[in-house]
Amino acid sequence: MSRKNRAPKREVLPDPLYNSKLVTRLINRIMLDGKRGTASSIVYDAFSEIKEATGNDALEVFETAMDNIMPVLEVRARRVGGSNYQVPVEVRPERRTTLGLRWLVTASRARGEHTMKDRLAKEIMDAANNTGASVKKREDTHKMAEANRAFAHFRW
């Protein structure tokens, strides 16, 4: 494999229904085996379910949920003098979004509802209300960073 250049980041196109890049990234994260049609129908059905249940715009609920899921701090392992320290660092904006989407989809897949659209819709609504497994994951990450605050001076 060539080590000459780093592959350029490809621009994500906004989805046709909501004109949002975040929704496209959610569809890409849900997609398995290249089945984009299935993934987009899951997301759009979940969004219509959210609109029915809350009465609010599904995109706004989703963006609120993402704000509640995305972490601000995380810990990174740093080797200093023969021992590893968990050093708290701020999360870059791109990584914040990636982690938020990853945690949302993982938490949705772990839920008990019958269909994926139900699971995704319920997890997004829970996250918008600051509850649910994905928000708990963020809280755990922040707690870990807070607990290791003493090692913040090892930041690089």
Swiss-Prot record:
What quaternary structure, including any partners, is listed in this protein's UniProt entry? Part of the 30S ribosomal subunit. Contacts proteins S9 and S11.
Q: Which InterPro entries match?
A: Ribosomal_uS7, Ribosomal_uS7_bac/org-type, Ribosomal_uS7_CS, Ribosomal_uS7_dom, Ribosomal_uS7_dom_sf
Q: List the disulfide bonds.
A: none
Q: Does the keyword Secreted apply?
A: no
**What name goes with this protein?**
Small ribosomal subunit protein uS7
GO CC, alphabetical:
small ribosomal subunit
State the function annotated in the UniProt record.
Answer: One of the primary rRNA binding proteins, it binds directly to 16S rRNA where it nucleates assembly of the head domain of the 30S subunit. Is located at the subunit interface close to the decoding center, probably blocks exit of the E-site tRNA.
Gene name, per UniProt, is rpsG
Key words, A-Z:
Ribonucleoprotein, Ribosomal protein, RNA-binding, rRNA-binding, tRNA-binding
Signal peptide range: none
Family classification: Belongs to the universal ribosomal protein uS7 family.
Q: What does the record list as GO biological process?
A: translation
Name one matching Pfam family: Ribosomal_S7
Q: What is the protein's species of origin?
A: Streptococcus equi subsp. zooepidemicus (strain MGCS10565)
Q: Which SUPFAM superfamilies match?
A: Ribosomal protein S7 (SSF47973)
Instruction: Please provide, alphabetically and separated by semicolons, the GO molecular function terms listed in this UniProt record.
Output: rRNA binding; structural constituent of ribosome; tRNA binding
